[in-house]
Design a protein with these regions (language model features):
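Sec-dependent signal peptide recognition
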Residues: 2-10
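C-terminal motif of bacterial Sec signal peptides marking the signal peptidase cleavage site
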Residues: 15-19
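Surface-exposed, beta-sheet-biased, low-hydrophobicity segments with strongly acidic/polar composition
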Residues: 21-322
């Protein structure tokens, strides 16, 4: 059964939405409106550096809140063997030529930044980070090979984006463990011994997430239990000299790996948009063209110039893949 949701964003961390179900039966049940106040603040930090990411299940009007600093890398549960960095902490990485983790130390970090600057971001810094669009084939960490010798040591800056305290750099090496699991070797960059962790793929998650402090953690809902998320994250910008990595707050991420799709409906002014939102129904949904992509909403819902706030001339139609 498909679920369509229309969303009118009314404040930085509040959403109003109407859900309607599309079924084989042409009779649609009445839609219900709901408003969710997002729990983005982890402690006393400003909203522009909210410590939490918030994941929303729109059809269930549920949210899951997780600390952005609560995980470091994610192990893909799909057919390929891929590992992602935590873009919400702005983690960066570099792959070395070595495959002996004990032989890598602080000297290997000389000259490395593995980060970006809000005041002077550079195009050449893009290589430190995973593909912004979320293409799982374009991660900094290469696909994990079935041949152990091909899997090199990787240095990771865990990231300090959005007020996260700087933490020691980490060195890792990842191997395949049979046909459905990974072996992670990891240590602080100055350590000469390493820890080992086994991570099994499963059928209910897109990624199994790992914290270098706490091991395997539950820092994202199961793949079919969220539609969109709200977070501070690494993204990209163009200030005239090409794309550069740039950190943004209040970004909306779409669960594109689960097939969630989106349409943005823009109108002449706020009053027209509100009237269209109130009139939107199942027939409107059926006639709407939706698109896929991790950042189909991104920051388009809000304005920073000349005034900061939600853009009231638009709303969004979201369809899950269930």
């Amino acid at each position: 059964m498909k679920h369509f949701t229309t969303i009118l964003i009314i404040a930085a961390v509040a959403f109003t939405f109407t859900a309607c179900k599309k079924d084989i039966d042409p009779v649609f049940p009445p839609a219900t409106d709901a408003e969710i106040q997002l729990n983005g603040i982890a402690a006393a930090e400003p909203g522009s550096a909210a410590g939490n990411s918030v994941y929303l299940d729109l059809s269930g009007a549920k949210q899951k809140t997780v600390l952005r600093s609560g995980w470091d890398i994610g192990f893909y549960c799909g057919a390929d063997f891929r590992v992602i960095l935590n873009s919400t902490s702005v983690a960066g990485a570099k792959v070395l030529a070595a495959n002996d983790i004990t032989a890598v130390g602080a000297a290997d970090t000389i000259g490395l930044v593995l980060n970006t600057s809000q005041t002077n971001p550079l195009p050449e810094q893009m290589i430190f980070f995973d593909d912004i669009s979320g293409d799982i084939t374009k991660t900094v960490i290469p696909a994990v090979s079935a041949v152990d010798a091909d899997n090199k040591v990787i240095i990771i800056n865990r990231g300090n984006g959005g007020g996260i305290a700087a933490r020691p750099w980490i060195k890792i090496r990842i191997l395949r463990n049979g046909s459905n699991a990974y072996t992670l070797q990891y240590a602080r960059i100055t350590e000469t011994t390493f820890k080992t962790l086994q991570i099994a793929k499963d059928a209910v998650n897109h990624f199994r997430q790992v914290s270098f402090d706490d091991g395997i953690v539950d820092n994202q809902p199961e793949k079919d239990k969220w539609d969109i998320g709200w977070t501070y994250t690494l993204y990209q910008a163009n200030f005239g000299a090409g794309l550069v990595p740039y950190n943004f707050s209040d970004m909306i991420v779409v669960n594109h790996l689960s097939g969630v799709t989106v349409a943005q409906k823009i109108y002449a002014d706020a009053a027209t948009a509100l009237a269209a939102y109130n009139a939107f129904n199942a027939d409107s949904a059926a006639a709407t063209t939706l698109v896929s992509g991790k950042w189909t909403i991104a920051g388009s819902w809000r304005s920073t110039q000349p005034a900061t706030g939600a853009r009231l001339d638009r709303f969004y139609v979201i369809k899950d893949a269930s």
